[in-house]
Amino acid sequence: MTENEQIFWNRVLELAQSQLKQATYEFFVHDARLIKVDNHVATIFLDQMKELFWEKNLKDVILTAGFEVYNAQIAVDYVYEDNLMIEQQHQGQQGYTEQAFQQLPAVQSDLNPKYSFDNFIQGDENRWAVAASIAVANTPGTTYNPLFIWGGPGLGKTHLLNAIGNSVLLENPNARIKYITAENFINEFVVHIRLDTMDELKEKFRNLDLLLIDDIQSLAKKTLSGTQEEFFNTFNALHNNNKQIVLTSDRTPDHLNDLEDRLVTRFKWGLTVNITPPDFETRVAILTNKIQEYNFVFPQDTIEYLAGQFDSNVRDLEGALKDISLVANFKQIDTITVDIAAEAIRARKQDGPKMTVIPIEEIQAQVGKFYGVTVKEIKATKRTQDIVLARQVAMFLAREMTDNSLPKIGKEFGGRDHSTVLHAYNKIKNMIGQDESLRIEIETIKNKIK
């Protein structure tokens, strides 16, 4: 691409993005490519079904960019995957170059190259999902098919989808891979219906080696006739040919209430794994990894403070670091203290769910009352079985129900260090998963505290 062609195309994209909603831009413009500008004609490669949208909505954009760069009216010649090779054969060196064609893969995977297994932080809450994803990437279509990953927003489902795709692509650069949200699958279905080009949609999705569908619950929300039918047929075509399918959702297959039963049944053919919010240790590990992207010093107490402020998902942690970076750059600060971090994230905390301020003393009192021990005994060093349990439950609840840092909590329990609090928290958390009676006890205490 010449310098003028690059300037022209960048201007087209800039103008399009300023005029379209982000979702519309991503769907209709993101995958388009400029091949060349010759004799005042811009040759643009895109999906055939999107040509009508470009003609109707982006003609003025191309005209504007053309006059700005070439001082001429630029016409457009749209080419598609199936006719690009034909044009090249007819035009030889005067037409499209081999290099240009190679830059246009048979399938636009839409994978994000920054996501890999290497930079995904593992913890107890996502260990099985990671293991299953790696197994699928190593032997697609044979191990778990489909793989269904569910969990709340911001927990790493999209990261794992892309990591699977990038891993497969690394081993087999010719693999036909497609990452797409269920919402965009629906959008493509609608466009193909309107253009009467459903055969193209079938060709595109039913000949894949790996299909990665994000937020499949969006498919359940749609009542458009034929959408679920088309996905059902796509699923069957791929599965029958031992092609790997990976799906993510914010709920289990059984809770996709508006989805046809036959789809739900197929989603459960393979393996279903859950990702839950990261525990404190994992949040610390995530932050320790993320701060390497910033040119600031983060002392350990600051990292632990931040890990204690956001416990619902990874996006909150990433957003907090961006807030801190903004404040630190403005103040020209190199070392991020707890006070600086607290100032930087104040607005984010105010925008988020409000946490009722609960004194640790109140937690200790309610736990002691429930287990028949005194607050003094909870804070002391005595290690009889009933006191140790009460002490660890109180530490667990102090971590769960307040935004105090681990060192602060330890100080309220007789001056214990943060590692003792962390050990107690993890121990009780693990016990809750195995002991239903303990879980009920802790819920009872929490209700009394609230």
Curated annotation (Swiss-Prot):
Residues 1-84 are annotated as: Domain I, interacts with DnaA modulators. Residues 84-109 are annotated as: Domain II. The keyword DNA-binding applies. GO terms for cellular component: cytoplasm; plasma membrane. ATP binds at G154, G156, K157, T158. CDD domains: AAA, Bac_DnaA_C. GO terms for biological process: DNA replication initiation; regulation of DNA replication. Residues 329-450 are annotated as: Domain IV, binds dsDNA. Keywords: ATP-binding, Cytoplasm, DNA replication, DNA-binding, Lipid-binding, Nucleotide-binding. It is found in: Cytoplasm. InterPro entries: AAA+_ATPase (IPR003593), Chromosome_initiator_DnaA (IPR001957), Chromosome_initiator_DnaA-like (IPR020591), Chromosome_initiator_DnaA_CS (IPR018312), DnaA_C (IPR013159), DnaA_dom (IPR013317), P-loop_NTPase (IPR027417), Trp_repressor/repl_initiator (IPR010921). GO terms for molecular function: ATP binding; ATP hydrolysis activity; DNA replication origin binding; lipid binding. SMART domains: AAA (SM00382), Bac_DnaA_C (SM00760). Residues 110-328 are annotated as: Domain III, AAA+ region. Its main location: cytoplasm. NCBIfam families: DnaA. Domain I is involved in oligomerization and binding regulators, domain II is flexibile and of varying length in different bacteria, domain III forms the AAA+ region, while domain IV binds dsDNA. Oligomerizes as a right-handed, spiral filament on DNA at oriC. Plays an essential role in the initiation and regulation of chromosomal replication. ATP-DnaA binds to the origin of replication (oriC) to initiate formation of the DNA replication initiation complex once per cell cycle. Binds the DnaA box (a 9 base pair repeat at the origin) and separates the double-stranded (ds)DNA. Forms a right-handed helical filament on oriC DNA; dsDNA binds to the exterior of the filament while single-stranded (ss)DNA is stabiized in the filament's interior. Belongs to the DnaA family. This is Chromosomal replication initiator protein DnaA. It comes from Streptococcus equi subsp. zooepidemicus (strain H70).
